[in-house]
Design a protein with these regions (language model features):
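Basic, glycine/lysine-rich polyanion-binding surfaces/domains
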Residues: 1-177
Length: 177
């Protein structure tokens, strides 16, 4: 996965132009919006999640395999708006998914999240999102904090799976690959 943070005074208008889904639906709180990213002809380039971080600041998480294509698309559109892009090359994303995910999360963070809502502090962003169709969260941080969180979950006996397993779950849930 690829993490992009956006800055500037015209982010909402930028996102209205960039994606077909209505970004104004998530402006009232820290929430997420699933959306396709389209090319100029309306063809799908990728699926991504847009996160409202508060104060009209946004983050997009897209697929890693399309990060360069997406970054170029973001830059092209951003040049028409007062928007700067920060590709977070040191980002860590841990997808904690499955029926016990919230219980496992609560052993580390005492938070409750509704679907497509998020929590953020100085070190992490935790979003009630995921690409598996299962109950779960995605934990985004820098690489050092991500390793700390990863090691904690491994020490608790939580089993990691790879992208192939995640992609199988995506297919079962009817999500695009």
């Amino acid at each position: 996965m690829a993490v992009f943070d956006f800055y500037g005074s015209n982010q909402v208008e930028f996102l209205k132009y960039l994606i077909p889904n209505d970004v104004t639906k998530i402006l009232d709180s820290k929430r997420a919006l699933y959306s396709p990213l389209l090319n100029e002809e309306g063809g799908i380039l990728d699926d991504l999640i847009v996160y409202h971080l508060g104060n009209e600041n946004f983050r997009i998480i897209s697929n890693c395999g399309t990060r360069e294509q997406n970054y170029a698309c973001f830059q092209k559109v951003a040049s028409e708006f007062d928007v700067q892009i920060d590709f977070k090359s040191d980002a860590s994303i841990i997808a904690l998914q499955g029926p016990n995910s919230m219980k496992n999360l609560s052993s580390l963070y005492d938070i409750k999240l509704e679907k497509f809502h998020l929590y953020q502090d100085e070190e992490v962003m935790i979003a009630r999102t995921g690409y598996t169709g299962e109950l779960g969260v995605e934990i985004i941080s820098d690489a050092n904090k991500g390793l700390e969180i990863w090691n904690y979950f491994i020490s608790k006996g939580i089993q990691p799976i790879g992208l192939a397993a995640r992609d199988t779950l995506r297919l079962e849930a009817g999500f695009n690959l």
